[in-house]
Amino acid sequence: MHVGIDDFGAINSSRGAGYGNYILRSVAGCMKECLSDKQRIYHLVADQYVIVDLEASSAEDAVALKEKITDKLRNFIVAENYEAIFSISIGVIDAATFCEGTEECRKKFEFALKQAKSMGKNGFYIFDQDDYEVFLRKGRIIATLRNAIVNHYDGFEVYYQPIVDCQSKQIIGAEALMRFSMITEEGREFVSPMEFIPLLEETGLIIPAGRYILNEAAAMCCEMQKYIPDFRMNVNVSYVQILQGNVERDILDAIQKYSLQPECLCVEMTESGFMDMTPSFCKFRKTLDKNGIPFVIDDFGTGYSNLHCIRDMNPSYVKMDRDFTAKAMNSNRDYELYKNIIPMVHSINVRICAEGIEEKEWLLKMKEMKVDYLQGYYFGRPCGKKQFLQQYASGINIK
């Protein structure tokens, strides 16, 4: 068992190192009183301990020991008149791990406690190999992302999906979508955006990666305008780029570099990316409005999306989530809800783009509902720059 005291730093900061050392000794004493003759406790480092069970104990035994220790510590806290209130988190690994070598054992020990602490205070986690493999894969992907960015964004690619005017059925623009692949033992693997984009955000690598995608998309917009003069490009922006970077400056630089009209570069964000009008977000929105850059709410209809969001964010248009669209096409109840949202949104001068259009019948229904723009596999799947130019430079033919 790998044991860690939760928020021990706060005890040291508020009461001093002397009292902190007293807590360390007391916690060790409390735990020792809970152990059998076949169990040993060792102080590992700082606020961490290791309990070794020399018997073939089960997971249930580990849970029981954890509860016993927790009760003992709770009594200690009461006896100390609540001078320090704390808990412990415990990660449990099988003793067989010791046979795998010191380094592997250390890694799994650290992983188990980290997982326990990620559950909140008083966490308890029993090592699971599948969880560990996910953890290792996450580390490999992060390392590969860093290396790719350093090496001129090798592995990153921009895919484009057409956006079509609902009434004329003519292509008016595209959404730029970040894609990433990495070399593995089996060959090149395309990593799902659902997997690598959160890692980019978590590490802050979304700032340089997002800047690269933005410039590639702006260059593509400039290229497409040779064939479709009013072509517009939609780019996605993360809350991390707003909080930690200077994405509004990046957007303005891209517009200037490729001599684009501001209204031709649309900025998309999902509602979950909004930050309750923090100073950084307000500055970002004001910069877009001041320079005439359209702002788009993506994936509307998911989570707790509401019309207050549209009112407060004042977007140029909203994109109805593809799952919401599919439900509306297959359920009368959802269809009525979908249909009635459209005039409400239009009433405040906000346009609507329906995502996830996959069939001609869906196109016709959207036209009846007076949706403004359409996007989905019916018009084309996301594809690379070369293929997109070949397919759409001369427009799009919808029957």
Can you describe what each PLM-predicted range is?
Residues 96, 112-157, 167, 199-206, ...:
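C-di-GMP signaling machinery
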Residues 168-173, 203-280, 356:
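Catalytic core of bacterial c-di-GMP phosphodiesterases, primarily the EAL and HD-GYP domains
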Residues 53, 183-186, 238-245, 264-279, ...:
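EAL-family c-di-GMP phosphodiesterase catalytic domain
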Residues 5-32, 42-46, 50, 59-67, ...:
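Conserved long alpha-helical elements within nucleotide-processing catalytic cores of c-di-GMP signaling
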Residues 28-59, 293-297, 350, 360:
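Conserved helix-loop-beta segment at the catalytic/binding core of cyclic-nucleotide signaling proteins
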Residues 137-199, 236, 297, 354, ...:
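Active-site core of bacterial EAL-family cyclic-dinucleotide phosphodiesterase domains
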Residues 43-52, 80-115, 122-128, 230-238:
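A short glycine-enriched loop-to-beta-strand structural element that forms part of the catalytic core
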Residues 63-67, 80, 95-121, 139-142, ...:
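Catalytic-core segments of nucleotide cyclases and related cyclic-nucleotide turnover enzymes
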